[in-house]
Amino acid sequence: MSDQEFDLSKIRNIGIMAHIDAGKTTTTERILYYAGRTHKIGEVHEGGATMDWMEQEQERGITITSAATTVFWLDCKINIIDTPGHVDFTIEVERSLRVLDGAVAVFDAVSGVEPQSETVWRQANKYGVPRIAFVNKMDRMGADYFAAVESMKEKLGANAVAVHCPIGSESQFVGMVDLISQKALYFLDETLGAKWEEREIPEELKEKCAELRYALLEELATVDESNEAFMMKVLEDPDAITEEEIHSVMRKGVIENKINPVLCGTAFKNKGVQQLLNVIVKWLPSPKDRGTIHGINLKNNEEVYLEPRRDGPLAALAFKIMTDPYVGRITFIRIYSGTLKKGSAILNSTKDKKERISRLLEMHANERTDRDEFTVGDIGACVGLKYSVTGDTLCEENQEIVLERIEIPEPVIDMAIEPKSKGDREKLAQALSALSEEDPTFRVTSNEEIGQTIISGMGELHLDILRDRMIREFKVEANVGKPQVSYKETITTSSNSETKYVKQSGGRGQYAHVCLEIEPNEPGKGNEIVSKIVGGVIPKEYIPAVMKGVEEGLNTGVLAGYGLVDVKVNIVFGSYHEVDSSEMAFKICGSMAVKEACRKAAPVILEPIMKIAVITPEDHLGDVIGDLNRRRGKILGQESSRGMAQVNAEVPLSEMFGYTTSLRSLTSGRATSTMEPAFFAKVPQKIQEEIVKK
């Protein structure tokens, strides 16, 4: 069967998501090993020698660098999209969840649900992504599969149900009972887990497995209440229910987001990975199951709903940009409708720019294959796109459709950066430009007043990693300043301004006259600039110049020079001079006018507030809470289990520099914390005065 003819129902677009240390990379690596080693579908059991490298290979921590990898299993094509586990990279998680049809959430059998797992789970809820869970690291000291299932219910509000019962635990973990087939699976150590034996359920687990299976069937009956025949069987004769019936009801429940089945295993010891692959195919949705996609028709601003059809109009979303040393700029896309052919001319409807596809590439675990076309349900890479960035829609030139954008959070931390030598200046500019194209949460701005380049990102780790990439990939050395908080400015009342820009110094002069009205926009909505000019008081050709001037004026605030956000600007009146008016004059005038209006609109400084979760031994709880209060923190709540307490709080980022070190000394190194940007809030007056003085 050629790739082109792949049946839509046989495609799975999935992501593997987890907390940073839950073993996501190992799980992904083993999936690639079992499914991606050969392109012959489902041929896995090579056995013996080819496996030798696995056990000696000490966890190298390979992460798929490619955004999407294609493997084959049980006659299905699985596109795996990688998602990072660290909070500084939430945009990566956002953009991958946006294009997924289903996901596998990996949890650590000892820790269960950790703070970062909650963040990723919330993001998956936002996009309605169906999930199955894999409790990993069952061979670790303190592993507890059932406690992990309970923590999913308590902390995530998930409808988590056990579909396995572990046989043995910690170093004695040898396999699991599959509650659906009612068979015990024992993994053979001599094949490093590649093969297993099906045996009868051990005597000591029979009663427990019968209870667990009945609980699973009861849960499935409530998930699909329309299936009365299944419900009656559960009540009257549960043993008569076939595996096929269970899989059918489970698939429906997973796709409708009503149930989250939980498997167990240990990816490092190769136990349970093939079982996970089987249920990815059996339970997670195909693009067909996910149904219509919603967009806007730009010609009439009406909503459109596109069916996932090969012969439908083209609609694709660019979700990641990568720079490849051999191929150049690669744009990863997901096709929701229609077919995209190599060499075709298309429209980037978000930017209203025409693009041409020079090559189409399908990424396998470690190699790329050229393709002539991608069709509905495919995830792949395009070469040749010049203007497209994360979140842009690609469609046919006569079909102006825009899909829902990917939400991009505002950066919260700034650093000054300069090349180590003058010769590196141009290389640094190229590196910064390429990195900001790849990562929309990484911004580069110039502070003209002090002649500095400022880089902004989602956290210290985020900027450190980008700095490493500059050295490794772009061979450019740079000096960076200390991390600074990325403050913003906004206005709190409405105001207006009337500004004239007039210069007369012999010969042709400069003349522009602009009247603006401004008001606060909804928080998080960004700046909006609208022309309400009627009757040609400012000629049509000068309006874009006024808008550009206003936009540039908002880039530097009126209190301390931080960018203004959430301001709505209406251009309402003005005048011009036949000879002396020019685009430049109106641009300068627009910038002056918006600054004047903002000064009168009670401007304030906003600071990033971080959501922090601290996990600490209970005997240090008082110290941790006291310390957060001293940092202007607002405690949101706390919970305790097994001698450990989790404190959730919101704290200004400016108070959190060096927090990890002070938490270590406060708790003798026994507490851990995670932090993620939450929102921007008004700075207290006293602190605002200090910032302005600086």
Curated annotation (Swiss-Prot):
Molecular function GO labels: GTP binding; GTPase activity; translation elongation factor activity
UniProt domain tr-type G: residue ranges: 9-288
Subcellular location: Cytoplasm
InterPro entries attached to this UniProt entry: EFG_II, EFG_III, EFG_III/V, EFG_IV, EFG_V, EFG_V-like, EFTu-like_2, G_TR_CS
Chain sites annotated for binding GTP: 18-25, 82-86, 136-139
Protein's GO biological process: ribosome disassembly
Alphabetically ordered keywords of this record: Cytoplasm, Elongation factor, GTP-binding, Nucleotide-binding, Protein biosynthesis
One Gene Ontology CC term in the entry: cytoplasm
SUPFAM superfamilies: EF-G C-terminal domain-like (SSF54980), P-loop containing nucleoside triphosphate hydrolases (SSF52540), Ribosomal protein S5 domain 2-like (SSF54211), Translation proteins (SSF50447)
Transmembrane segment boundaries: none
Function text: Catalyzes the GTP-dependent ribosomal translocation step during translation elongation. During this step, the ribosome changes from the pre-translocational (PRE) to the post-translocational (POST) state as the newly formed A-site-bound peptidyl-tRNA and P-site-bound deacylated tRNA move to the P and E sites, respectively. Catalyzes the coordinated movement of the two tRNA molecules, the mRNA and conformational changes in the ribosome.
Family of this protein: Belongs to the TRAFAC class translation factor GTPase superfamily. Classic translation factor GTPase family. EF-G/EF-2 subfamily.
Protein name in UniProt: Elongation factor G
